Amino acid sequence: MTTPDAGGAPGGGLLVRAVRVVAVDRPTPDGEVDLRLRGGVVTEVGVGLAAAGDEQVLDGEGRWAIPGLWDKHVHLTQWALQASRIDTSGTTSAEDVLTLVRARVAADAGAGELSSGGGRTAYPLLQGYGHRTATWLREPTVAELDAVSAGRPVVLVSGDAHHGWLNSRALQLFGLAPREGVVAEDEWFPIFARLGEYAGSPQAVEAAVRSAVAAAHARGIVGIVDVEWGDAPAQWQARYAGGLRSLRVRAGVYADRLDTTLAAGRATGDLLVPGFPLVEMGPLKVISDGSLNTRTAFCHEPYVDAVPGAADDGRGAPNLSSADLAELMRRAREGGLQVAVHAIGDAALDAALDAFAASGAAGSIEHAQLISPSAPARMAALGLTASVQPAHLWDDREAITRCWPDRDERCYAFRSLLSAGVPLALGSDAPVSPLDPWLAIAAAVHRSPDARSAWRPEQSLTLREALAASVDGQGTLRVGSRADLVLVEADPLGGDGLGGGDHTAYLRRMPCA
């Protein structure tokens, strides 16, 4: 449940009876207690509290109470569109994907000229999501996708969202030049941002967003940092006007909207809807390098499987120069914006730290999938947060074995970061991994989703640490805590006697009341 800072529960407040407070970061009272929520905060913790006349009463029935959970890196509209896309996540080759596309085209043949939104269009766009080419034996081609799509435009988004596999009709639709292979990185992101335009009517897309928010609430989510492409602040202002008011949101922008954001005088933390405290301005998001899957993450050393003679020396490449990055961040700082820098390769991370130091900006490193030995101490000294997505390590395990086997001890190094004093914030990067905080927690604690042993277990977090990294710094519920809380049916810190696989399953099915 989420209660605004101004207004609280209808009728003036809420008394939650008979809950067991989970000790996230400090000891808690023994046994069941009552929590009084008023004005957006916890105002009293005790046993047998008397209900005030204007309070609603909720019986917790002995459930466990934790602070509301957050996902610190989401592309919410793209996540909402997943239900209508072909799921290519289980594929291991181009042939596997082509089989799925061929089957979907055949199944949809009866749709004729009907678009997914019910309007009339000659070529309804078919979308898919989830394949990862890093472990494929060859790269996919436009021609082979043409051969199975029967003249229908097709866009297949990679599992890391850093490239799109388009057929010729889709290339024409988006005004791109013919080519043999995929569309990647800077050329790709504007296309990715527009996919919602072809997923049905605006009303249908927003209905999908509402369904995604409801599903997130059911998993205990009370807040997200939404770094959706396009104008996320305007999207959330419109959603507020349309009645979507149950989720805390920090809406970020990208460099293409920095000028208009600064001109509007918006700083990180400013309310996007006057008088409504749940929707705030978020950070400036900067994508400084690429991804592991596309082999565009910027590294100090070449990828082990790099193609000889590659234009980037097999190390990936930065998306902007060090000087341009520092200048962008300086402008953001002067305008009151924090900066969230996407940095996956170790060279990209070190360059981002240089830019933070030069610009004086505050904020976070997003992903930090491969870190240099000096990075944790530098991040701590700069006061930066590591915004990490633990479920990605489950997806990237084979790719790292192929691309970075000589440096895997520095991949997803959560323990190294935390031990150096770097605050961690867990997220999903949905749709790259599902918007499910319990999945992220399970992956951070048990670095294997299956019967295999944990991958680099020395970098695991404890369950308490992972939970603490998922609650937006709120810690154990107490007087003065934000009045966002989740009641769960089982002890989230329990299950210690279970084996790795069983404990992972225990966390992933955590039932929220």
Name each model feature, range by range.
Residues 11-38, 42-266, 293-348, 362, ...:
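Divalent metal-binding segments
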Residues 23, 436, 448-513:
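C-terminal cap of metal-dependent C-N hydrolases
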Residues 75, 278-296, 382-393:
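Non-cysteine beta-strand/loop elements that form the S-adenosyl-L-methionine
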Residues 167, 220, 281, 290, ...:
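Conserved, mostly hydrophobic/aromatic
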Residues 168, 233, 237, 349-357, ...:
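Histidine/acidic-residue-rich catalytic or RNA/ligand-binding cores of hydrolases
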Residues 247-282, 363-369, 373, 399-423:
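Phosphate/diphosphate-binding loops
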Residues 292, 337-346, 388-390, 417-440, ...:
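Short acidic/histidine-rich active-site segments
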Residues 356-362, 378-387, 420-423, 445:
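Glycine-enriched alpha-helix->loop->beta-strand junction motifs that scaffold or abut catalytic
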